[in-house]
């Protein structure tokens, strides 16, 4: 028997030798390495995890990253790269310098206290009269009495509400009365009760139960991190060493941040290229025994398209996986519209948590959001250290400790002031405006005036407040750049290139807003179509183009240096970025935390 097997193996080896005798040695080596890699991808858990964690990087990005990893250690390469990057970002630094050139910036806290008038002057606000400057206002609504900032109605998703003067004065009173309170202590029972009321109101709004749990957070990113951290901690408690967060590729970047902070692995699922929504059958193939939580958007930030929440809920139930719905952008819009035919909240079996921003369509002061958990959620965002030498330490949430009760009180006051009927009125007016813009765009490309639906179109079938624009004949970023020259401040998108307009209550108060936008959009597209061949990008278009050809390591470093420049007014006006200068801290705390979770993976490679 053994002799037969030996003869068989000898014959197989001889046949293989004959087959490969004319094949160059380097091809045999590379082919063997490739087969070994493919085998390990499917059979070696460590390499499989590494490959899954890389699934959100395009092949082009992987090639760029690999080339940079090889080249960065060559003599003089870093100096050349730094020189070029400083050229690319010089316009950004100059813009910061110009913005701050007329400001009086102090290096230290004043020795003696300043008067209220002197302090207010630093805010560049005319305290006597500061109205919102609209394109044109056709009504006499109280929202014209705006006391916080200026604008002209051309910003995308920057300002979500215009508070009546009465509400602004109320919030000033509320803040003054509650700024020094702390919900963490039982000294202020009314603040604690208000917080419970706000959470109950939000649970009811999203059709949760009385047994549901919730947090008032500082914003959407914080709400997302709280939810993801709860699920990752639960997964580790179950013995899952490498928890995975499974999200559509259109999910907000906050999920990537949450994965890095918790040491989880982010798994991105491709969306349908035609609809822009994730396919539940495709997502199902990405769920494994390591999945800590799966995510759906309602709607997504990019193009305002919601994922099929009901079908994803069924998938979550089938796979026995927690399901988080990210409604940070539109939650307090959709909650006041009729979504009974396609629910996106706790009415869907399988949904275990929801994130929704109060400071967007909830019209609340900035820095307010909620993270809600269903009564049957397998994890809650709670932290407790009961053996601490300082006593018992427990917080309703993983991140926050002490916070100001003013945040609770101002949310309570704002929600109470508007009421459900006003929120419904605002939500319906935004949907009417979105429909009007789409109707005008359809008429524009059908009139035969030189533009077609190939030149400019709305991606997918958005049903809420965001319109994502693309072009098959022009660079969409060039179109956005032309619109910026006409005063519009829109959000640029990438992979693929596009831009979006996020409609808010502000835009509904602008007379003939849709006509003005479509007029400027038409002119912008025509101008771009008439660009000379080889037109070079500039401004934001140039930055997006340059970043797309950079290694991820450099992309992160540039963002880090830019944020440092924003906080250091001297760095905004002079000096180089010093990208490759030695640093006492070689890596971010978040990245370090994630590496703890992936240490075994990296070691095995």
From Swiss-Prot:
<dbReference type="InterPro" id="IPR015421">
    <property type="entry name" value="PyrdxlP-dep_Trfase_major"/>
</dbReference>
<feature type="modified residue" description="N6-(pyridoxal phosphate)lysine">
    <location>
        <position position="360"/>
    </location>
</feature>
<protein>
    <recommendedName>
        <fullName>Probable sphingosine-1-phosphate lyase</fullName>
        <ecNumber>4.1.2.27</ecNumber>
    </recommendedName>
</protein>
<dbReference type="InterPro" id="IPR015422">
    <property type="entry name" value="PyrdxlP-dep_Trfase_small"/>
</dbReference>
<dbReference type="InterPro" id="IPR002129">
    <property type="entry name" value="PyrdxlP-dep_de-COase"/>
</dbReference>
<dbReference type="GO" id="GO:0030170">
    <property type="term" value="F:pyridoxal phosphate binding"/>
</dbReference>
<dbReference type="GO" id="GO:0016831">
    <property type="term" value="F:carboxy-lyase activity"/>
</dbReference>
<dbReference type="GO" id="GO:0019752">
    <property type="term" value="P:carboxylic acid metabolic process"/>
</dbReference>
<keyword id="KW-0663">Pyridoxal phosphate</keyword>
<dbReference type="InterPro" id="IPR015424">
    <property type="entry name" value="PyrdxlP-dep_Trfase"/>
</dbReference>
<dbReference type="GO" id="GO:0030149">
    <property type="term" value="P:sphingolipid catabolic process"/>
</dbReference>
<dbReference type="GO" id="GO:0016020">
    <property type="term" value="C:membrane"/>
</dbReference>
<keyword id="KW-0456">Lyase</keyword>
<comment type="function">
    <text>Cleaves phosphorylated sphingoid bases (PSBs), such as sphingosine-1-phosphate, into fatty aldehydes and phosphoethanolamine. Possibly implicated in influencing the macrophage autophagy pathway.</text>
</comment>
<dbReference type="InterPro" id="IPR050477">
    <property type="entry name" value="GrpII_AminoAcid_Decarb"/>
</dbReference>
<feature type="region of interest" description="Disordered">
    <location>
        <begin position="580"/>
        <end position="605"/>
    </location>
</feature>
<dbReference type="Pfam" id="PF00282">
    <property type="entry name" value="Pyridoxal_deC"/>
</dbReference>
<dbReference type="GO" id="GO:0008117">
    <property type="term" value="F:sphinganine-1-phosphate aldolase activity"/>
</dbReference>
<comment type="similarity">
    <text>Belongs to the group II decarboxylase family. Sphingosine-1-phosphate lyase subfamily.</text>
</comment>
């Amino acid at each position: 028997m053994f002799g037969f097997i030996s003869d068989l193996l000898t014959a197989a080896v001889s046949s293989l030798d004959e087959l490969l005798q004319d094949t160059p040695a380097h091809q045999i080596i590379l082919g063997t390495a490739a087969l070994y890699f493919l085998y390990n991808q499917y059979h070696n858990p460590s390499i499989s995890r590494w490959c899954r964690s890389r699934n959100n990087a395009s092949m082009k990005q992987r090639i760029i990253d690999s080339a940079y990893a090889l080249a960065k250690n060559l003599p003089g390469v870093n100096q050349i790269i730094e020189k070029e990057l400083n050229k690319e970002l010089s316009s950004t630094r100059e813009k910061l310098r110009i913005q701050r050139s007329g400001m009086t910036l102090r290096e230290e806290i004043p020795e003696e206290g300043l008067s209220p008038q002197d302090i207010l002057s630093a805010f560049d606000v005319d305290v006597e009269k500061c109205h919102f400057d609209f394109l044109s206002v056709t009504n006499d609504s109280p929202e014209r009495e705006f006391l916080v900032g200026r604008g002209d109605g051309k910003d995308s998703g920057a300002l979500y509400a215009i508070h009546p003067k009465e509400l602004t004065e109320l919030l000033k009173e509320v803040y003054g009365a509650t700024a020094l309170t702390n919900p963490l202590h039982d000294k202020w029972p009314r603040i604690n009760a208000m917080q419970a009321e706000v959470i109950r109101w939000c649970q009811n709004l999203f059709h949760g139960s009385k047994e549901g749990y919730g947090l008032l957070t500082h914003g959407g990113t914080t709400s997302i991190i709280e939810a993801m951290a709860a699920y990752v901690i639960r997964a580790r408690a179950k013995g899952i060493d490498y928890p995975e967060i499974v999200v559509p590729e259109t999910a907000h970047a906050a999920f990537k941040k949450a994965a890095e902070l918790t040491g989880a692995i982010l798994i991105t699922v491709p969306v349908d290229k035609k609809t822009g929504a994730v396919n539940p059958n495709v997502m199902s193939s990405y769920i494994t025994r390591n999945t800590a939580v799966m995510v759906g958007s309602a709607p997504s930030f990019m193009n305002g398209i919601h994922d099929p929440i009901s079908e994803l809920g069924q998938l979550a139930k089938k796979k026995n996986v927690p399901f988080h719905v990210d409604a940070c952008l539109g939650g307090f819009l959709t909650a006041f519209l009729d979504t009974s035919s396609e629910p996106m909240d706790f009415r869907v079996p399988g949904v275990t948590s929801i994130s929704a921003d109060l400071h967007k369509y909830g019209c609340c002061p900035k820095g307010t959001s909620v993270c809600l958990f269903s009564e049957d959620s397998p994890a809650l965002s709670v932290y407790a250290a009961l053996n601490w030498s300082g006593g018992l330490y427990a917080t309703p949430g993983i991140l926050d400790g002490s916070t100001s009760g003013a945040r609770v009180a101002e949310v309570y006051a704002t929600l109470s002031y508007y009421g459900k009927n006003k929120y419904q009125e605002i939500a319906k007016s935004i949907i009417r405006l979105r429909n009007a813009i789409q109707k005008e765009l359809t008429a524009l490309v059908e009139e035969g005036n030189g533009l077609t639906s190939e030149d400019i179109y709305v991606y997918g079938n958005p049903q809420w407040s965001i319109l994502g624009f693309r072009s098959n004949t022009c660079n969409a970023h060039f179109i956005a750049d032309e619109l910026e020259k006409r005063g519009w401040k829109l959000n640029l998108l990438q992979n693929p290139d596009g831009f979006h307009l996020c409609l808010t209550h502000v835009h509904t108060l602008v007379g003939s807003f849709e006509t003005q936008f479509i007029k400027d959009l038409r002119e912008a597209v025509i101008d771009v179509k008439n660009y000379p061949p080889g037109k070079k990008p500039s401004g934001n278009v140039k930055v997006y183009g340059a970043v797309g050809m950079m290694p991820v390591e450099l992309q992160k470093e540039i963002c880090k240096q830019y944020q440092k420049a924003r906080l250091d007014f001297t760095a905004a006006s002079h000096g180089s970025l010093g990208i490759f200068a030695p640093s006492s801290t070689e890596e971010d705390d978040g990245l370090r935390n994630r590496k703890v979770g992936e240490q075994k993976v990296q070691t095995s490679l």
